[in-house]
């Protein structure tokens, strides 16, 4: 049989069958324009889709800046089995190699899908086995509504509303509202109504899936996120001082509600002339809203919630579900805030009348709510001593202010059970004069204005070096570069008055090893320029050399470093030393407009009692002020306790110094008649210890806040007056937990004039206190006065020895009877020191002429042996001085050796405490002629 006709028959049957099948199964896939909305379905939908399908669609938008949105019909049925056989996948591009947005199967329809660009790739695949109804989706151009609802607000006040308010808002919105304020203006935002779609499965605050409102401290997605809000709970009042506050409003394609309405207004920030960083932050007043307070757990009866943890609250307090040192109370301050002190209080149960309180606790801080640092004292976690009963308030001061946003209190020990109420003290960074954040955090400084010497990878580029808002930070190419080789630079756009920087460590990503994941800079230098070419370094005013600033001790906790104002448009930071993980840095620049800078004294510390000391809670606002000179100017990297600098001007306050008000009298100046004395204004106060000689003696102590100077010594200045012959002694002692060390002493009448005292406070690994001890001997009439204690930033250390006679060597000591013990110095004074102490105000006839007729009598017993020792010591010093004078006279009388002898005397070194050596030079003219 001829095979040729048979072949033609088979071919005809094949093509005819193929044509019939093609007519029955319409082709799937294609290229679709989303200019007009349309639908894509699986073949045969809603009937079962056929087997062996491989359909591909490309959906594109007519404009390159447009996006595409896909919404699926809830009737969705594709074979399961982990999407191995039948599935639909969507990719963010025009091919199968684009990023996968989702791969779906089963009976649950996918959520709304939005492209990042103008093209989407869709693929549907089925195998030979089981089939289902398939899918149906609608594609269209994603309409954000930004043309209608995105606005900038610059007027002093205004209203922000969701689109269509008070009617229901539209679907698929992405709106941005930005409030812009001028420097020294605070933005206050108050919501009037709030109603967005609520997620019934919402777990916690900010867990919003459908419609929500984000509020940003700065430009959206650049500045830190303050909070995410949805449902019907109205956000509390917001106060921003960074100059930019933004809101982004997102809605999906489903349920729509009435939306929101809010009012904003701007108020001028005028810092006080004597800025004090000791303001209650709002736990007691309610300025900290309930939504900002949370806890690890709450007692099951619902009567001891975190929101009841406000100081002096009349309804119980916060109690966890279980009493454990793993529990914590947390406060979100919403913005970066200086924390300087914490006040705690227990609670009495309204149901059982039993008292519960926390006896000790730890402090944890964070800038983002995820990376936490336990507050340390030296190398160990600091354990704060808290309450001894359920009602008294205990104030604990931090020895250095902390810049943070989130605060956790972790109870360590307690009585009967954990119960806590508290208040936080501090201030905002921008409260200080000329301390505006110039735009790194808020995004006002663009990415193009941030540069660096080198960059490791894109994820750690200079644009990631924004304070707090970035989770990574800047990493240079070489993690272990030479000191000063790498730098990070900020272009401020226009010349500004720059007064400081805030420096923070950085976090690495997945491509950085675990050891390198957390890096920070320990020491750095700062340079500045007006043109980007001519650079100058910030100078240390004490040494007139390039200032080497202290950096961070933790990768998440920021530190402020201030310096004298300089004009600059460009600022560079040069890392000099860093953590083992290498160089990692985030940054903000502080300053103000070039014409706004004013020389103002400021401090960053509260005038509160020392930590671990039980004190009555200061109810009066004046009780936390300590005078116009109570603070040292622009802390300038001196990490000293708040309240150290003090002039004792306010009647009920001694800054951070502790003394017995019954012994140290507060006296008031009247303008001096002596032109050689320094001039004081009327009503200026000082402290005075006095005796009229009718009692056996007098002894008083004046104790500083805790000092921690592990890195470098500083110079302490004060004014003093000592009258009363050889029975008067004033000494300064460094007291630590294990030892006491004499630093300075005078033990004789100094006359009626006020004198300067200067002492070097040495570096010391442990925390210590400075103690002024005054002694007026038995049967002696005299007085000792002290005023204006402060840390000097303009006196070189080599000049910080005044008078020289007060530095008599290591072995010299004035014996003081052991009348004190323990660490709490209020107990020492109240319980163990004898004598009648009174707090009075008296006037003097002159700066150096007190009225002796009104002097108080004191009672103190000096041992006769002690008096003998003092007398013999005085005689020894007198004989030594006489011999030295004779030797000097003889030496200078011999002309051949006079020059060499004077030179030898000039080069004589006095060796002081802690290995510090200071040269005391004698004037050439006085060397021989006055002998």
UniProtKB/Swiss-Prot annotation:
SUPFAM superfamilies: Concanavalin A-like lectins/glucanases, Galactose-binding domain-like, Spermadhesin, CUB domain
Ranges facing Extracellular side: 21-864
Intervals, Cytoplasmic compartment: 890-931
Residues spanning the membrane: 865-889
UniProt note on tissues of expression: Expressed in developing CNS, PNS and in some nonneural tissues including limb buds, developing bones, muscles, intestinal epithelium, kidney, lung and submandibular gland.
Gene Ontology terms: biological process: angiogenesis; axon extension involved in axon guidance; axon guidance; cellular response to leukemia inhibitory factor; dorsal root ganglion morphogenesis; facial nerve structural organization; facioacoustic ganglion development; gonadotrophin-releasing hormone neuronal migration to the hypothalamus
Location within or outside the cell: Membrane
Domain spans labelled CUB: 28-142, 149-267
Disulfide pairings: 28-55, 83-105, 149-175, 208-230, 277-427, 434-592
One Gene Ontology CC term in the entry: glutamatergic synapse
Skewed-composition ranges (Polar residues): 298-310
Residue intervals of the F5/8 type C domain: 277-427, 434-592
Positions of glycan attachment: 152, 157, 629, 839
Membrane topology, record value: Single-pass type I membrane protein
Record-linked InterPro entries: ConA-like_dom_sf, CUB_dom, FA58C, Galactose-bd-like_sf, MAM_dom, Neuropilin, Neuropilin_C, Neuropilin_MCO_CoagFactor
SMART domains attached to this UniProt entry: CUB, FA58C, MAM
Annotated stretches, region: Disordered: 298-317, 601-621, 819-854
Chain residues that bind Ca(2+): 197, 211, 252
UniProt-listed PROSITE patterns: CUB, FA58C_1, FA58C_2, FA58C_3, MAM_2
Similarity comment: family membership: Belongs to the neuropilin family.
Assembly and binders: Heterodimer with NRP1. Binds PLXNB1.
Written domain comment of the UniProt record: The tandem CUB domains mediate binding to semaphorin, while the tandem F5/8 domains are responsible for heparin and VEGF binding.
Official protein name in the record: Neuropilin-2
